[in-house]
Amino acid sequence: MIYVKGLSKSYGDNQVIKNIDMHIAPGEKVVIIGPSGSGKSTFLRCLNLLEQPTSGSIVFDGQEITDPKADINEIRRHMGMVFQHFNLFNNLTVLDNITLAPIKLKIMTKKEAEAEAMRLLKLVNLEEKASA
């Protein structure tokens, strides 16, 4: 669950996000739309503290992540985000690209991550591409 209260973000005198209040329930799908330059990406980056909000608070799964004492790296282990511009590592196989994060973050062992990756690849009929 995510609660956003009074979230604002400014770059100098340019306020790009102004006083956003939002509640996102578990499993809820949310779409953020708007014209170029309206603050969509900045808002998303603030949600996982890739950008520090100027003011306001964000509560994720009962923990205020905007609290300076919050362990944001631990919190991010339980968050997912797809970046606007993302790329795969060309020097890694499909399987290695999929398993990189769960192994590096110690969420899964290599064996567990590979089994889950193969399960997901099979769901989309791409298991034969695992070593590509």
Where are each of the predicted segments found?
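Short coil-to-helix segment of the ABC ATPase nucleotide-binding domain corresponding to the Q-loop/switch region
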Residues: L92-A101
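Helix-to-loop junction immediately C-terminal to a conserved catalytic motif
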Residues: N48
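Conserved ABC ATPase "signature" region
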Residues: Q63-E64, T99, K110-K129
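Short coil-to-beta microelement around the adenine-binding A-loop and adjacent beta1/P-loop entry
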Residues: N14-Q15, N73, E128
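ABC ATPase NBD coupling module
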Residues: I65-G80, K110-K111
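The feature captures the beta-strand-to-loop junction immediately N-terminal to the Walker
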Residues: I33-P35
